[in-house]
Regions:
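Short acidic-hydrophobic surface loop/beta-edge motif
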Residues: 15-26
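Extended acidic low-complexity intrinsically disordered regions
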Residues: 1-14
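Short, surface-exposed, charged amphipathic helix/loop patches that serve as local interaction elements
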Residues: 27, 32-157
C-alpha cells in the first residue's frame, strides 16, 4: 500500500477514484483512467506496432495488386519491399492501419467490464471488429480519449 492509499482508505478506494463514466448510444461505459506508466506503455504499443502485424496487413492490402507487377503503369510502382500506389506507400498504409488497430485495442482495454469476473486483457482487434463497425470504434476511442485526457477547460476548472 502506498502512502496516499493508506491515507485515503486503501488501494480499492484509489481504483474507484480512477474510474469515470461516459454515455454512448444509451449505454453508460465505465473507463479506468490509466496511470502514467500505463499510458506510456499504451503509447509505445500504439506508435510501434509489431512488424509481423504490419507485414500481415501489408500482405492483405497488396494481394490484389500483384497482377499489376508485370504491367507498366504510372499508378503502380513495385520496389523490393513495397508497392507505391498513386504515390502512396502501401507499407506505410499498413503501418498506419496497425497503429489504428492497436489504439482501438488499448483504449477498449480501459473499459471496466460490467461483470467484475470478466476481463478485456486478451481482446483482439478481430473481436472488436466483429462487434463494432469502424465508425463506432472511432467514436468509442474518441469518447474514451476525452475521458482519460480532460480538455483544458476541464483541467482549469
Amino acid at each position: 500500500m502506498t502512502k496516499i492509499s493508506a491515507i485515503l482508505g486503501g488501494e480499492q478506494k484509489l481504483k474507484d477514484i480512477r474510474i469515470r463514466k461516459f454515455e454512448l448510444g444509451g449505454h453508460t461505459f465505465k473507463v479506468r483512467i490509466p496511470l502514467v506508466s500505463e499510458s506510456d506503455a499504451m503509447y509505445a504499443k500504439i506508435t510501434a506496432p509489431e512488424d509481423q502485424k504490419i507485414d500481415k496487413i501489408y500482405g492483405e492490402l497488396t494481394a490484389s495488386l500483384i497482377q499489376f507487377k508485370e504491367k507498366e503503369s504510372e499508378d503502380f510502382k513495385f520496389t523490393d519491399n513495397d508497392v507505391i500506389v498513386e504515390g502512396r506507400s502501401m507499407r506505410q498504409a499498413a503501418k498506419n492501419k496497425a497503429m489504428i488497430e492497436a489504439r482501438v485495442i488499448e483504449y477498449i482495454k480501459l473499459l471496466v467490464p460490467e461483470d467484475a469476473e470478466q476481463t478485456l486483457e486478451n481482446i483482439t482487434y478481430e473481436d472488436i471488429e466483429a462487434e463494432f463497425p469502424f465508425a463506432v470504434q472511432m467514436t468509442l476511442v474518441k469518447s474514451i480519449g476525452d475521458v482519460i485526457s480532460p480538455s483544458y477547460e476541464e483541467a482549469r476548472g
